[in-house]
Design a protein with these regions (language model features):
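A structural signal for well-ordered alpha-helical scaffolds and beta->alpha junctions
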Residues: 72, 123, 173-177
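Basic/aromatic DNA-contact patch characteristic of tyrosine site-specific recombinases
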Residues: 1-60, 66-73
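Long, amphipathic, Lys/Arg-enriched alpha-helical "connector/arm" segment
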Residues: 153-187
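Compositionally biased, low-complexity repeat tracts
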Residues: 29, 145-147, 180
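Alpha-helix boundary/N-cap detector
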Residues: 39, 43, 92, 167-171, ...
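N-terminal core-binding DNA-recognition domain of tyrosine recombinases/integrases
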Residues: 49-63, 73-162, 187
């Protein structure tokens, strides 16, 4: 497969033909640590740069931003290899991507439901932002309404898996609880 989207970070000095990349990025108003995605044909999309620097994405924790931008790079590369730009993503593309990521027979790096939920959250953040600004016709992340255990209605991605544990909770057996209570609390 041809090379996909490339990721750079403002403030990171690069060698080769990219030696002045960080300096040029700062001069253009990019923030320190801001990601820059470069398409396979060498272009930087100003709309993505706006998203990375001036949206809810920019206020996310550093680890979240780093994870999300890697998800964007993979999904955009998938779209590119399918003949589409990031702003042309369709629901069908996301369905194909979900199938490849979770169940793809030739995929050596399949992922689980928890990582897929994170990827959906990343894509939902981007595409809802882009749709609100008219950069895309609509988000490829379709939503449905579900009821929580207390009866509140929430919108969740249609492709969200239903069998995902949100945390790895370890429960104490009654015997272990009594031991913890007697030794840990009572001394």
């Amino acid at each position: 497969m041809a090379e996909g989207w490339r990721l750079f970070w403002v403030g990171v000095e690069l060698g080769g033909g990219w030696a002045d990349f960080a300096v040029r990025g700062r001069r253009l108003g990019f923030r320190e640590g801001q990601p820059i995605l470069v398409s396979p044909d060498g272009r930087v999309d100003a709309r993505l740069s706006e998203f990375f620097g001036r949206s809810r994405f920019a206020s996310r924790a550093t680890g979240t931003r780093e994870s999300y931008v890697l998800d964007y790079r993979l999904f955009f590369s998938f779209l590119w290899w399918s003949g589409r730009g990031w702003d042309q993503a369709r629901v069908e593309d996301l369905e194909d991507w979900e199938d490849w990521r979770l169940r793809g027979r030739g995929n050596p790096r399949r992922i689980g439901g928890a990582k897929w939920i994170r990827e959906l959250a990343a894509l939902r953040l981007l595409y809802e932002w882009a749709a609100a600004r008219g950069y895309v016709v609509s988000s490829p992340v379709w939503l449905r309404v579900v009821r929580t255990s207390v009866g509140a209605a929430v919108r969740v991605p249609e492709l969200a898996p239903v069998d995902v544990r949100s945390s790895n909770v370890k429960w104490l057996t009654p015997r272990a609880f009594r031991l913890w209570r007697d030794v840990g609390l009572r001394g």
